[in-house]
Structures are given as C-alpha cells and as structure tokens.
Amino acid sequence: MRTSNYLLSTLKETPNDAEVISHQLMLRAGMIRKLASGLYTWLPTGLRVLRKVENIVRQEIDNAGAVEILMPVVQPFELWEETGRSEKMGPELLRFTDRHSRPFVLSPTAEEVVTSLVRNEISSYKQLPLNLYQIQTKFRDERRPRFGVMRAREFSMMDAYSFDIDKEGLEKSYQAMHDAYCKAFDRMGLEYRPVLADSGAIGGSGSQEFHVLAESGEDLIAFSSDSDYAANIEKAEALAPTAELAAATQEMELVDTPNAKTIAELVEQHGLAIEKTVKTLFVKASDEIDADIVALIIRGDHELNEVKAENLPQVASPLEMAEEAEIRALIGAGPGSLGPVGLELPFIVDRTVAIMSDFGAGANVDGKHYFGINWGRDVELAQVEDLRNVVEGDLSPCGQGTIQLKRGIEVGHIFQLGTNYSKKMNCNVLGPDGKSATLEMGCYGIGVSRIVASAIEQNNDENGIIWPTALAPFQVAIVPMNMAKSEEVKAAAESLYAELTAAGIEVLFDDRKERPGVMFKDIELIGIPHTIVIGNRSLENGEMEYKDRRDGNKVAVPVADVVEMIKQKLA
C-alpha cells in the first residue's frame, strides 16, 4: 500500500477527551474517529488491525469445531420476554418499535436468537454436539461510554453458542473453547490470564473471564502466589477463617461519638484498631424475606462485594442501598451510627466479622457507638456469608500461597449456561432414550474491538504503538529519503516494494513528499514492526538501513539481503 493512495490521518496532539493511552494512540494514529458518544468510525489503519484480530479468532474458533453463521443485529423483543431478560438487562438494552409498532431490540448478545434458531433446526441428539458462532456488531447503551473502543456503545464481538445433549458434552465443549481462546490470545502476543468469574446477567453456572493485564484495566483480578487459582474481584474468595471465636476481654460500653460518622473518624478519634470495627450497610431486600431492608455487616477495613451480596437470596438484585430517609424511619438513626446490637432487622455477617470479639459498631443512635461488643453475649450471631472483596495478603482459598491483585481488561468470557435458556425457550430434542431432552448450552464471547485497545495498552512507548507482529496493520514500512529529488532512491524503493509485495508481505510504502522526520514519526506512531530506510548515502555503500520498532535497533543491510532478512524476521 502506498501512502499516496491511503488515508493516513495522524494527529500531532492528543485530544483532550482521551483518557487512557490506547484511546489517545488510536486517535493520534488515525485508527478511529469519534462520531458520537461511544460510536466510532474505523479508519483504514484501525480496520486492518481489527481484521487481523477477527481472522485469528475465526481460525482458532473454527479449529475448535465451531461453525460460523451470521444473525441479525435487530431482534424481536418477544424473544427476550421468553427468557425474562427483557427487564433484567435494564437500560443497556436499546428498545425501539418499527412502523407497525412491533417492539425490537438492538442486539447486545444473541442467546435468545440462537436458541430460537436451534429449537427450530435440531430435532435429535444425533445432530449434536453443535457450536455456532458469529463475528458481529453489538450495541449496549452504556450509561457512560469511555476509554474509546474499550467501553463503547457499539462494538465488534465474537459470540459462540454450544449445544450438547448432556453436562458431560457441555464440559467438553467448554474446555475446547477455553483452549481455543488461549491459542488465539497466545498468537496475538498478549499477556493475559483466565480467571474464575460471576455469570452476571448472562446466567448459568461456571464461567471464566480472560483478562489482558494492564495498569489501565477497569477490573481487579486476584490470583494465588503459589497456585493456579485466579478469579476476578467479584468472584474471588479468601480462605475461610479457621480461628475460633476469641473469648471476650471487655464489657460492652456505650460511647458518645458525635463527630465520628465514618470508620476512619472513629479510629482516629477514639483509638480503635480498624480491624476491631465493623460497618453495617442497609440494602433493599428481595421478595424472599418478610422485610424491606436487610443489613450486611463487614469489617471496618473491608469493602462490600456487591456481586456476592446481590447473589444472596435475601438481597434484591440489582443491589440497591437503602436511602437515609428509609433507614431513619426504621431505626431512628442514620448511616455512620448503625450496628447489630438491638437491631430488629434481618442481618447477614461476613465470615471475618463472625470470629471477631471486643469490636466496635454503631449503637443505632446518632452520635453513639458500642465498644467491646461480643457475639453471643451482646448480640446473637445471625447468618454468616462471604460478603467482602479480597485484599492483598489474604490466604488463597486453595490453601496455597497468598492473594495478589493486578488490574486487567476483560477481553473474553465463557459460560456454562446449562439449561438456563433452553428450558425457558423449549429447546428440546429427542434423546438417546427416545424421550425429550432439554439441551445443555454454553456461550462464549470475545471482545474483538476491545482486544485492539488492550494490545495497545500493553505495547506502547513515548513514540506510539508497538504492535505484536500478528496484529500490526502492516508488517514492513519503506521510508525513502527525499525520493522526489533522487531517481536512485526512487528506483530502489520501488524495486524493494515490488519484491516484498510479491512475497506476500504487507508493506506500507511512504511515497509522500514529506520531510523524513514527519515520515519517521508517523511510522513509529502507527507501530509498524519493521522499517527499511533508503537514502542516497546508504545506497552508495550498497546498503539499506533496517530499524526494529520494538527495541529501536538499527542495522545496515546489503541491498541484496533485505528481502531475505525481512522474511526471516517474519518467519
């Protein structure tokens, strides 16, 4: 490709609204342009990278035995009503009606559509296993689109759906897709980790996320220092406490704390150790219990894990904190003064709180706390659950090593759905025993456009992007110095371009009438792995200059050896 025939729209300055490095560099390198909030046009350089990602994903998913199809982006709303997800998805699901007032949605995912397809096309277990996938545009009406294509409203995604006659078959399909993901991400040159995950709105039982490790990642992942255990922060657990409840050494005392409305203020003003405090959080209750509010009690230095909380049957999903007015109407006190002693509401205690003794908590009276609280003596211990986020240094749940935390960008997710969708949508076939059997489903997603941004987060320097070779928009750049003034340089550049192109190598030939400095900056910015510089002085010595984008090394190469050297670099 010649730059004279190409849209090379690079920017010198970083746009003000670009927060993370991938968004900045994708704009500066002319990969994308913003059309509206969360909506981007992919320019030639970006589209070439996107297609590279798609092709690697397609090859590995094909190798796993999946079959490609293409489903509509527009889906009938009635399918979503069949599974009950029409409301569970919330405002992210974009709804609209056609001219005949028939309701539709813009696809954020396709479980309903593919299940509808399979229930009409498959009738016997003999047609299984079956794994169908597509690479298609999706839309989720994000409340706050940010970070460029990392969290856009419209995005490209590979979504696959497996159908098996039994759980054993589902597990085989699931493992095959897990392995395909690993092969795809390995080929892309990404540093990533598969981690245990919560199934969220998709539903089902087991699931794993695949995270590209990056400091800019929105997600925290936890992993053991000495084992293979890894989970996202929503799913991660620490080893359950094994210590017995310590004996009381203090009498419970009511203390005036008028200026201590937070745990930090309580610790600072009254000298309590923070691990000897608890905080009591009031959340909306589900219909499972005869109460409007349920209290969740965690240690003062811990944070509530909202996913763990809303997975409890007593807690409304999605999780909703009680308003202060509601709390005051029930208790007569506000947040900052709440605690378990005398609390006439259902409450659930975190595992770490259940083994605490002599601790402090709000007295359910504004400006007062109890110190020296002990379970059994001052308040009966209620239901005990794992409610908190893990922290660095926690013991790993496998019993090997301690928990470490890193930031990651989720680029893939795989689920064992079981019969969660197939049962609701009557997706049944004739089983081997001659009876009707509900299909076991798995679903699998890869954020194709998000991978592009994630790769940049891992591969950049002060000059721009440093693409892994497998994802680079071009493999080689040819930069002729002052070609317009030198027939020798022009002839050598044209000859090299023809040879490399004939060898099937993807080349960007910078034939612009630009200063060499401008050309070099653009080539480095867009991240082409290998650059050949051609100038009069080097040609007089029978050489061309080779530059490696990743390490910056330059070396003079005999003209006759350049093509072979490039082939070896790309092998």
Swiss-Prot record:
The keyword Protein biosynthesis appears for this protein: yes
GO cellular component assignments: cytosol
Main location: cytoplasm
Catalytic activity: tRNA(Pro) + L-proline + ATP = L-prolyl-tRNA(Pro) + AMP + diphosphate
EC class: ligase
Keywords for this protein: Aminoacyl-tRNA synthetase, ATP-binding, Cytoplasm, Ligase, Nucleotide-binding, Protein biosynthesis
Annotated PROSITE patterns: AA_TRNA_LIGASE_II
Coiled-coil positions: none
Role noted for this protein: Catalyzes the attachment of proline to tRNA(Pro) in a two-step reaction: proline is first activated by ATP to form Pro-AMP and then transferred to the acceptor end of tRNA(Pro). As ProRS can inadvertently accommodate and process non-cognate amino acids such as alanine and cysteine, to avoid such errors it has two additional distinct editing activities against alanine. One activity is designated as 'pretransfer' editing and involves the tRNA(Pro)-independent hydrolysis of activated Ala-AMP.
UniProt comment concerning the protein's domains: Consists of three domains: the N-terminal catalytic domain, the editing domain and the C-terminal anticodon-binding domain.
Record's protein name: Proline--tRNA ligase
Naturally occurring in which organism (per UniProt): Photobacterium profundum (strain SS9)
